[in-house]
Amino acid sequence: MHMKSLTFAIAIAGTLLAIVSTPLGIAADNALRIPAFTAYLEPDNGGARISSKSGVTSWKDASTKVLWFGELKKPGELNVAVELRLPQDANSKLRLTVADQSHDAVVKGAGTNTVTARFGNFTVAKPGYQKFTLESLNASGQSSGDIDALVLDGVTTNNTHFNYKSRRNAASVHLGYPVPKGTNVAAFYCEMTGVEDPVHTYYMACGWHRGYFGMQVNSPTERRIIFSVWDSGGEGVDRKKVEDDNRVKLMGKGENVYTGDFGNEGTGGHSHLKFQWKTGEKQRFVVTAQPTNQTFTIYSGYWFHPEKKEWMLISSWRAPKEGGWLRGLYSFSENFGGNNGHIARKALYGNQWIRTDAGQWLELTTARFTHDVTGKSDRLDRFMGVENGQFFLSHGGFNEGFTKSGESFPRPATGQLPDIKLPLP
């Protein structure tokens, strides 16, 4: 009996020794492995890189942190580790913070083999989204390792929600505006206010079946008012492949407005005005349709310049194989760069009106919420609602809750007809 117990103890000890001393690249069967290519960098200023092929690489700036976000639907104990690669015998000291608890780990490299930095147990006191913050405690310039994955034990896929795909953008979210049946829409007016303003944000006010009109945050120092109209035909990527009789043609543009081509999301004519629109300040947009015959329609985008206090033409385009009015009216909010999909975006959309071909103004007070495929299951932090009498769209930030796709909301009518005096295109 004593011999059997001794043999059993030696076997167990040998197993534990092997686990500790052997580089590990595979998580335990019941553990979750969250790929490093789903993480974010903070700040994202070149201190490391993230790619779908290699995860987090070139991490030599000790001020750069690696962040993962996920929803834990039940409280409890969580054992956390990080898989990484380091040069042979190189050391890296790392710190992981979860739920206001920080643990350190030192790991020795094994060349091309993966090693595991084990941070031990963390107590998650309440369900909800959690941030996993990985920091380097190494000297700046020293490699902290190439990160492959965050590994969680103590949870299962049934009570967690993470995005496992390399697309790190927040879900795109939309407002669809129903219009009375049989209405010929000659103009669509919408007021919009950016509440949050992270880089790579497109707040779009006036969209229709042939284009969209709104404002972007393109960099920390550049913002734009943007108006685009799609070509006819089915080309989705390269405008050089679009036949001339399918191309939209520029008819006019405003002062200092750039015009050109766009592709990769359909093709067409693009225009933008560089303007430092202000967060929290209402912007006013109107798009018009002028059918010239049964074949062509001229679409024009006008924006109210808040400094000049007058309406300005952004651009005007003649669309072939059209001849109709504005259809499929909508607004959206888009995170068009994936490196900062963890930051919340929010805008207000209000006082929507349409003008019929007979000159009658009708107020639109109902909107229907939808989202893109990312919002279906990968990113659930997407919302619509009514705030201060206006619709709002919000996405990103890993905030609690979500709005169901297809849900409609009413807003209170304002009765405030648009005061519009448009310049000719």
Residue ranges and their predicted role:
Residues 9-20:
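Bacterial N-terminal signal peptides
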Residues 1-5:
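N-terminal secretory signal peptides that target proteins for export/translocation
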Residues 26-276, 284-291, 295-425:
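Extracytoplasmic
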